[in-house]
Amino acid sequence: DGYPFIIVPLLLAVAAGYFINAYAVVPLLLLAAYFTYFFRNPSRTMPTDDHLLVSPADGTVVGVEEVEEDAYLNQKCRKIIIFLSIFDAHVNRAPLPGTIDFQQYTCGRFRPAYKEGVGYENERYSIGIHSAHTDILVTIIAGILARRIVSWVTLGDELQHGQLYGMI
């Protein structure tokens, strides 16, 4: 999904180098390099124990709180909030193996992700994963820069530990 963001600046750099000058190429090459970095997919070694949860995203844990979840789990649960900066990989992985038995896309705003309350205001996509050991709800929330949510899975899909299922 990131290829157009990388290829377009590279093509523009070639055109700028040909029609303008070499100095016009530099910002376009830097932009292509940044998009290559942004859309990267680092390899991860997943645990073999299906009881273990892995982080669904690279980033920084900025909050852990008890909440009453009423869309999928319908119970009190622990909510873990992970903030992705512009330097983090924006791919999302299944935190445990299981079957997707809930899916919900919600249109919304594109406020900065670090602002309080954006989890309920911004565009978001949630999947519920049913495993042999537990159920879990994972939500991807768009922000002011990462504004597009892409999902590669649908209801009924079986996910493996750490399998890619989407990106912001």
Question: Which residues are covered by each model-predicted region?
Answer:
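Contiguous, well-folded functional domains in the mature portion of proteins
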Residues: 1-168
